[in-house]
């Protein structure tokens, strides 16, 4: 039996001097112990997800905690059967969370160490979910919400996190006077976004401390009132949260049956994320439209070594055909 892999999810807002130099040092250490993952380091802090066996992840946590800036850093730990990453990346960025405030004329960025929403533990957050007078707002990208979300949570009409401030301003009159509670995967986005809401004048703003990941592991709430699965930015794609009465809410793009399997459209110029069973991925050569299925650079065709005849037969079976210019 293979050894269990641990996946560590973490962040901390803390001032990091010479952050670019520290990022290089951080990468060197991670590679020296064989860790895999993706870490962002900025002047405002650190945000990462990494994976490895028990010994490797323990070495990493001990090393991080030995730095007084990160002595109290909170690692959220998952146990898995295989690696969640294939390589190790540590990158220096201007911010660990890009809310796009300066890009969109929203004045200056937010420092969560100075301004942020009230922390709610899982029990308090569950109570907020059950409170009719509380607005629960999902701050994640649309494709994350579509895979799973808290029951009754608002899905903003946005594609990604950077569009959220404008959406809130456009809909401010709907919940300006109400209690607003926000949530995200591990908490890092909500630290900054809830602070922005406070600065915008919202009087009662809360956030799920530790994010969805913590809510799903809490022994009391056990992920209850979460529907679907949680999207994660690694090879796992999704993880279960509700351990009381789990459900599947996402539907196969092609036939509408329950499905939590995300794939990217095989047309590299489209790359749309869709839910698809292995059977339908094969049937539709992972293309989200007739144009994508017949695209000359269809990645499914290339990855599976389909001949032109095999490709044409797949499309003919669903009433479509290859254009003449597509090569063999």
Swiss-Prot record:
Reactions the enzyme catalyzes: uridine(34) in tRNA + AH2 + O2 = 5-hydroxyuridine(34) in tRNA + A + H2O
Active site: 184 (cysteine persulfide intermediate)
Record-linked Pfam families: Rhodanese, Rhodanese_C, UPF0176_N
Domain Rhodanese: 130-224
Listed InterPro entries: Rhodanese-like_dom (IPR001763), Rhodanese-like_dom_sf (IPR036873), Rhodanese_C (IPR022111), TrhO (IPR020936), TRHO_N (IPR040503)
Keywords for the protein's UniProt record, in alphabetical order: Oxidoreductase, tRNA processing
Any GO BP annotation: tRNA modification
Domain of life: Bacteria
Gene Ontology MF, one: oxidoreductase activity, acting on paired donors, with incorporation or reduction of molecular oxygen
EC id: 1.14.-.-
PROSITE patterns: RHODANESE_3
Gene3D superfamilies, A to Z: 3.30.70.100, Rhodanese-like domain
Matches recorded under NCBIfam families: PRK00142.1-3 (NF001135), PRK00142.1-5 (NF001137)
Family to which the UniProt record says this protein belongs: Belongs to the TrhO family.
Function per UniProt: Catalyzes oxygen-dependent 5-hydroxyuridine (ho5U) modification at position 34 in tRNAs.
Protein known as: tRNA uridine(34) hydroxylase
Taxonomic source organism: Streptococcus pyogenes serotype M1
Gene name of the encoded protein: trhO
């Amino acid at each position: 039996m293979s050894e269990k892999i641990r996946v560590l999810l973490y962040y901390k807002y803390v001032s990091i001097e010479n952050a670019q130099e520290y990022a290089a040092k951080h990468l060197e250490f991670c590679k020296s112990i064989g860790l895999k993952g993706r870490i962002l380091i900025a002047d405002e802090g650190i945000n990462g997800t990494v994976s490895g066996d028990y010994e490797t992840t323990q070495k990493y946590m001990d090393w991080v905690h030995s730095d007084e800036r990160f002595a109290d850093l909170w690692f959220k730990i998952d146990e898995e059967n295989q690696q969640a990453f294939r390589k190790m990346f540590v990158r220096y960025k201007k911010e660990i969370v890009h809310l796009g405030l300066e890009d969109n004329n929203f004045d200056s960025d937010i420092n969560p160490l100075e301004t942020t929403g009230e922390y709610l533990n899982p029990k308090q957050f569950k109570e907020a979910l059950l409170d009719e007078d509380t607005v629960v707002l999902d701050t994640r990208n649309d494709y994350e919400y579509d895979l799973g979300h808290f029951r009754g949570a608002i899905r903003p009409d946005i594609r990604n996190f950077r569009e959220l401030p404008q959406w809130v301003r456009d809909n401010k009159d709907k919940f300006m006077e109400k209690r607003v509670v926000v949530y995200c995967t591990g908490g890092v986005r909500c630290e900054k976004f809830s602070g922005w809401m406070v600065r915008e004048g919202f009087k009662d703003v809360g956030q799920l401390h530790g994010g969805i990941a913590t809510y799903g592991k809490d022994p009391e709430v056990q992920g209850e009132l979460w529907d679907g699965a949680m999207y994660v930015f690694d090879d796992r794609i999704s993880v279960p949260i509700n351990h009381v009465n789990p459900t599947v809410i996402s539907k196969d793009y092609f036939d509408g049956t329950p499905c939590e399997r995300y794939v990217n459209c095989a047309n590299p110029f489209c790359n749309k994320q869709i839910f698809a069973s292995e059977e339908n991925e094969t049937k539709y050569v992972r293309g989200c439209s007739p144009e994508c299925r017949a695209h000359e650079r269809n990645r499914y065709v290339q990855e599976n070594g389909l001949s032109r005849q095999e490709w044409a037969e797949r499309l003919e079976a669903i009433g479509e055909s290859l254009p003449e210019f597509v090569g063999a």
